[in-house]
Amino acid sequence: TPVKRGPGSPKPKPPTATPPPSLPPGRIYAEPTFVPLLPGQLTTGEVNQYDAYASILQPIPPPRKGANMVMQLTDVLGQAAVDAITQSGKIVFHSVGDTGADKQNRVADEADVAGMMAKDLAITIPAEKPAFFYHLGDVVYEFGQADSYYGQFYEPFCLYNAPIFAIPGNHDGMIWAPSMQTLQAFQANFCTPAPVHATNAGSLMRTTMDQPGVYFTLEAPFVTIIGLYSNVVDKGPGIISSENNPKYKSIVSDDQKNWLISELKRLAPIRKQNKTAVVLAVHHPPFTGSGTQNTLGADLDDAFTKGGLWPDLILSGHAHLYERFERDVNGIKLPYIIAGCGGYNLSPYAKASDPTVKVPPSMANDPSLQAYMKTFGYMKIKATATQLAVVFNSIDVSYGIAADSIVIDLQTHAVTEGKRGREPL
């Protein structure tokens, strides 16, 4: 019979196994005292594998042979659905990263995030209904295993009746044995030549996504999303190219960065004519506050400069919380948003946040930090011909819907913070 504890009652002690009278030599059955894993804690075996491979760069798989690197939303939703979005004057889509709940004590958080996103799809007005989910990486943990996709991706999102695009995170690309091939399972689920039933989905019906590769462009009405792969390094900045570093050149080619520069050159005149907003998505955060500069950020800055176009918004995951920064670039405010709060676990060593304020007083000395929330949730991103908006919704009622939001004017680049609890645009 369950025993109810009052607020002042001591916490129950971990269960202790009853010792058997005797055991044959070499046999052990029960833990003397069971100590459950903390959120984010790895088993001993996982720690050994993690430490061995978490900093070993992997080659970036080339795009699928003959594939067009620019993916059209019409090829996925169909012309009629995209025409309806265009005629409505607005597109809405979901985005968040780091969803894969790999242990039982984390499943509920991912399920709650996925459930709230699925409920958004019940909206029938084309201008308000999310058209797709753009995943910011770390679909599964810890080592990109194919057998993790059912429990960490397909089942949690089984009620999400819309396309899901994704860029890989470091855990999607990590391996735990030299015989493994990096990103093999990710490509089998997101980069197939055509949509087919996903083997890893088991009896569930979702088909694979036919992205051209692990980096690509997605073109949709009012918005173009450039997605990059930032490799497997966990503790430290991501890497999209060799960065002219001799020790990287034998492993990581410059193909992705060269493609990015050419893609920015292609989009620059289109953006200048105000025909599309440009969003860049990369798993590792390239900017984490005033006075900081990492090599990934420097590499991207170089590409933006050479390509002649700076994105209107930069999205990333990796850090398991929600943060919004504004960086001064060429006289404008450029928003960098970290949203790695999709369900895996909240960063155990990050400072606590306060639902009553956007930025805790202890962090207010960084003028670039505009919002800091250590809570699970997801983003709704909206684009029109003249504006781009980001809305962060938390599954925690103390933060709630539209816990943070901004509207970007695509002509003046002005960034306006929205009112709490009210979705802009």
Where are these predicted regions, by residue range?
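Catalytic lumenal/periplasmic loop and adjoining terminal transmembrane helix
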Residues: 287-295, 330
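Extended active-site neighborhood of metal-dependent phosphoesterases/phosphodiesterases
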Residues: 34-39, 47, 52-81, 147-272, ...
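Acidic, histidine-bearing metal-coordination/catalytic regions of metal-dependent phosphoesterases
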Residues: 1-131, 150, 154-166, 179-184, ...
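The substrate-binding groove and active-site-proximal loops of carbohydrate-active enzymes
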Residues: 99-102, 137-146, 231, 243-253, ...
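Short, solvent-exposed loop/turn segments at secondary-structure junctions
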Residues: 99-101, 140, 171-173, 231-234, ...
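Short acidic, glycine-rich surface-loop motifs adjacent to enzyme active sites
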Residues: 267-289
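Active-site neighborhood of phospho(di)ester-bond hydrolases with catalytic His/Asp-centered motifs
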Residues: 95-97, 131-138, 142, 164-170, ...
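Extracytoplasmic/periplasmic, Sec-exported soluble proteins
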Residues: 105-109, 125, 248-255, 292, ...
